[in-house]
Design a protein with these regions (language model features):
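A cross-family glycoside hydrolase active-site/sugar-binding cleft signature
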Residues: 45-48, 72-74, 118-122, 184-186
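A general structural detector for well-ordered alpha-helical segments in enzyme core domains, enriched
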Residues: 58-62, 99-106, 170, 174
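Short, well-ordered coil/turn segments that N-cap beta-strands
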Residues: 67-69, 111-117, 179-181
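An acidic-aromatic substrate-binding cleft motif
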Residues: 27-79
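Aromatic-lined substrate-binding rim segments of carbohydrate-active enzymes
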Residues: 77-127
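Active-site-adjacent "subsite" loops/lids of carbohydrate-active enzymes
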Residues: 38-39, 48-52, 119-178
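Beta-strand-enriched, solvent-exposed domains that form extended recognition/catalytic surfaces
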Residues: 1-37
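Active-site-proximal loop/short-helix segments
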Residues: 78-81, 85-88, 133, 179-188
């Protein structure tokens, strides 16, 4: 009967289709995957809005329905070179409203749905607001001009010691303040 649980016992690693039938009639279907480590087969989705009133449970339900085990948090950071420096609420570089509490609520809800949360971060992107601080670490073209992207993002040498120390510390703050389990490190 509906509402009762069924135990499959111990299953070997692999993917399984599950059908709920009443005689020859299929009432519902789903799938499951058994793995020692979900990183072996990442099923990846993304989130791109973090307004204070976001329905995080709806996102978690969709992640569960689609069997996602990893979710990238795209465009969540305050600035490319200052990921969590904007306080609890701010506008991202594209002027979208961000609530860090919404980010944290999403991370918790997605964890309950079986998904790990990965913050997006640009490995060597610096916005115009922070460029003066980092222009000594600029990645230069052959003609001596700095590389840039779209007029809003400057490119620094990812091996520059000061940048690397800053970037690693910024990622650590994201783990401590947000709860991310990892990062999608973009290289453009």
């Amino acid at each position: 009967p509906l509402g009762e649980s069924v135990s499959f016992g111990t299953l070997e690693e692999g993917g399984y289709g599950v059908l709920l039938c009443d005689g020859d009639e299929v009432l519902a279907s789903t799938a499951l995957q058994v793995l020692d480590d979900t990183r072996q087969r990442l099923r990846y989705g993304f989130v791109a809005s973090y307004a204070p009133d976001k329905d995080v449970e709806a996102v978690a339900r969709l992640a569960r329905k689609l069997h996602f085990n990893g979710i990238q948090f795209y465009d969540w950071a305050y600035r490319h070179a200052d990921l969590v420096g904007g306080g609890e609420t701010y506008l991202d570089p594209l002027d979208q409203p961000i609530s860090l509490e919404t980010v944290r609520r999403l991370i918790r809800a997605l964890a309950q749905a079986g998904s790990r949360s990965f913050g997006y971060a640009a490995v060597y992107g610096v916005g115009n607001e922070e460029w003066d601080q980092w222009k000594d670490a600029a990645l230069m073209q052959c003609d001596g001009t700095p590389y840039e992207l779209g007029g809003f993002l400057q490119i620094v040498d990812p091996a520059a010691r000061a940048w690397l120390a800053h970037f690693i510390a910024d990622l650590q703050k994201c783990v401590e303040q947000g709860g991310f389990q990892g990062f999608h490190l973009d290289q453009y």
